[in-house]
Amino acid sequence: MSSIKIECVLRENCHCGESPVWEEASNSLLFVDIPAKKVCRWDSLSKQVQRVTVDAPVSSVALRQSGGYVATVGTKFCALNWEDQSAVVLATVDKEKKNNRFNDGKVDPAGRYFAGTMAEETAPAVLERRQGSLYSLFPDHHVEKYFDQVDISNGLDWSMDHKIFYYIDSLSYSVDAFDYDLQTGKISNRRSVYKLEKEEQIPDGMCIDVEGKLWVACYNGGRVIRLDPETGKRLQTVKLPVDKTTSCCFGGKDYSEMYVTCARDGLDSKGLLQQPEAGGIFKITGLGVKGIPPYPYTG
């Protein structure tokens, strides 16, 4: 196995960086800074960052097959036009819950945009519980709701054979699996495939590799962990020089690099001194496994 290298490739000082997505066409990493209401695009060749500011906390971003991007902004699914920096609302959820916002989101293999909600936090991971739900935006722009009673809707991905949906509700301290129907988008038969250990802290964003193993960013745990969802065993731990690791994705050449987002919010002045790269973007190389390209939203 090659030696693992971790480097901070962008000192962005994100309040809460999230939702890293690799855009192969531009050799860029997309990500968001939720409370700053910014969608960012880092060009891995020029090292330049472009930013678009929206009108509410933006919690996830995804590629769109017809061009541009889609994002979850407040409680809205939006289409994002990068050139003129405009956001067009495609659908709105949780209209009766004024204190809610979207959190993590990702597009499924059929081109639906899955995303879940949560109550606004009063401090990191401190919030009114069971206020969230999981939704998906179909290509025809109608929305389906899967379930409610969610604390912090978070990481999500699909198995390589497209038969299992993996999902994290952070405060359950569990990675869950559902049977998944690619044709209809329906999910069923929820079960836990991994329970986090105490030092791993809070499960946050997640991605899958070509071997069908899950990578989970552990908020307050300063690490990403690799899990085997079939055996429930942890296979690997990669520790980072920041505590508040939030999400991860594969990207770069052949999707052999991992990009990890993290947060500064919640660190006191001492913590910020000890973790000067908090809020930055990290690249991990030498993992010896590749990821898969992100699916684009087809609506």
Swiss-Prot record:
<dbReference type="GO" id="GO:0019853">
    <property type="term" value="P:L-ascorbic acid biosynthetic process"/>
</dbReference>
<feature type="modified residue" description="N6-succinyllysine">
    <location>
        <position position="244"/>
    </location>
</feature>
<comment type="function">
    <text>Gluconolactonase with low activity towards other sugar lactones, including gulonolactone and galactonolactone. Catalyzes a key step in ascorbic acid (vitamin C) biosynthesis. Can also hydrolyze diisopropyl phosphorofluoridate and phenylacetate (in vitro). Calcium-binding protein. Modulates Ca(2+) signaling, and Ca(2+)-dependent cellular processes and enzyme activities.</text>
</comment>
<comment type="pathway">
    <text>Cofactor biosynthesis; L-ascorbate biosynthesis via UDP-alpha-D-glucuronate pathway; L-ascorbate from UDP-alpha-D-glucuronate: step 3/4.</text>
</comment>
<dbReference type="GO" id="GO:0030234">
    <property type="term" value="F:enzyme regulator activity"/>
</dbReference>
<dbReference type="GO" id="GO:0005509">
    <property type="term" value="F:calcium ion binding"/>
</dbReference>
<keyword id="KW-0963">Cytoplasm</keyword>
<feature type="modified residue" description="N6-succinyllysine">
    <location>
        <position position="253"/>
    </location>
</feature>
<feature type="binding site">
    <location>
        <position position="18"/>
    </location>
    <ligand>
        <name>a divalent metal cation</name>
    </ligand>
</feature>
<dbReference type="GO" id="GO:0005737">
    <property type="term" value="C:cytoplasm"/>
</dbReference>
<keyword id="KW-0106">Calcium</keyword>
<feature type="active site" description="Proton donor/acceptor">
    <location>
        <position position="204"/>
    </location>
</feature>
<dbReference type="InterPro" id="IPR013658">
    <property type="entry name" value="SGL"/>
</dbReference>
<dbReference type="GO" id="GO:0008270">
    <property type="term" value="F:zinc ion binding"/>
</dbReference>
<feature type="binding site">
    <location>
        <position position="101"/>
    </location>
    <ligand>
        <name>substrate</name>
    </ligand>
</feature>
<dbReference type="GO" id="GO:0006874">
    <property type="term" value="P:intracellular calcium ion homeostasis"/>
</dbReference>
<keyword id="KW-0378">Hydrolase</keyword>
<dbReference type="GO" id="GO:0032781">
    <property type="term" value="P:positive regulation of ATP-dependent activity"/>
</dbReference>
<keyword id="KW-0060">Ascorbate biosynthesis</keyword>
<dbReference type="Pfam" id="PF08450">
    <property type="entry name" value="SGL"/>
</dbReference>
<protein>
    <recommendedName>
        <fullName>Regucalcin</fullName>
        <ecNumber>3.1.1.17</ecNumber>
    </recommendedName>
</protein>
<feature type="binding site">
    <location>
        <position position="154"/>
    </location>
    <ligand>
        <name>a divalent metal cation</name>
    </ligand>
</feature>
<feature type="binding site">
    <location>
        <position position="204"/>
    </location>
    <ligand>
        <name>a divalent metal cation</name>
    </ligand>
</feature>
<keyword id="KW-0479">Metal-binding</keyword>
<comment type="similarity">
    <text>Belongs to the SMP-30/CGR1 family.</text>
</comment>
<dbReference type="InterPro" id="IPR011042">
    <property type="entry name" value="6-blade_b-propeller_TolB-like"/>
</dbReference>
<comment type="subunit">
    <text>Monomer.</text>
</comment>
<dbReference type="InterPro" id="IPR005511">
    <property type="entry name" value="SMP-30"/>
</dbReference>
<dbReference type="InterPro" id="IPR008367">
    <property type="entry name" value="Regucalcin"/>
</dbReference>
<feature type="binding site">
    <location>
        <position position="103"/>
    </location>
    <ligand>
        <name>substrate</name>
    </ligand>
</feature>
<dbReference type="GO" id="GO:0004341">
    <property type="term" value="F:gluconolactonase activity"/>
</dbReference>
<feature type="binding site">
    <location>
        <position position="121"/>
    </location>
    <ligand>
        <name>substrate</name>
    </ligand>
</feature>
<dbReference type="GO" id="GO:0050848">
    <property type="term" value="P:regulation of calcium-mediated signaling"/>
</dbReference>
<dbReference type="GO" id="GO:0005634">
    <property type="term" value="C:nucleus"/>
</dbReference>
